[in-house]
Regions:
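Conserved alpha-helical substructure of the radical SAM core
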Residues: 1-113
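Radical SAM enzyme [4Fe-4S]-AdoMet core and its adjacent flexible, acidic
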Residues: 21, 41, 46, 64, ...
């Protein structure tokens, strides 16, 4: 993964974002999720050995690795091991996790390893505040699931597969 023989291009030296999704399993059905309504919620997990190979191949990568996707990565049975592998001492990249925070209390020490932590919540502002007390350094985003399209304001595009609203253009 060093350099393309024809072009000389090396992805490792390019700033950017790599998204790692280690499970398709999620414990919520958030209306802002990119998963479609019929997306299967399956107990399938990336093997930690494959994850390790992927991470070590990125040893010289200098961008951001985003630990998020179409599942809640903290539900992976080897979440702690994956976080440890992701944060090996030789890494040059930054890490970010985006989570719904429902496993935060039990796994706080793993979440604290990330350079950027984003907690999404749509239950209530009170639940968000509870999570904020557990992990104050995280960015907490509250999404009101009951908000109607006419209340969205002038945002040009809204994507919300869970609520069956696709690409609303103002």
């Amino acid at each position: 993964m060093e350099q393309d023989e024809k072009t000389g291009f090396s992805f490792m030296n390019q700033p950017g974002l790599i998204n790692i999704d280690v499970t398709g399993l999620c414990n919520k059905t958030c209306n802002y999720c990119p998963r479609s309504q019929g997306y299967p919620n399956q107990k399938e997990y990336m093997d930690w050995k494959l994850f390790r190979k992927f991470i070590f191949d990125l040893e010289n990568y200098t961008g951001m690795i985003d630990f998020t996707g179409r599942g809640e990565n903290s539900l992976h049975p080897d979440f702690g091991l994956l976080v440890k592998l992701l944060h090996h001492p030789a890494r040059k990249y930054k890490t970010r996790i985006i989570s719904n925070g429902y496993r935060l209390e039990q796994r706080k020490h793993y979440f604290e390893e990330f350079d950027v932590i984003i907690m999404n919540s749509y239950d209530s502002e009170e639940k968000m505040e509870e999570r904020r007390k557990i992990l104050p350094q995280a960015t907490h985003r509250y999404w009101n699931q009951n908000m109607k399209p006419e209340e969205w304001g002038e945002t040009p595009i809204q994507v919300s597969n869970r609520s069956d609203i696709f690409n609303r253009i103002a």
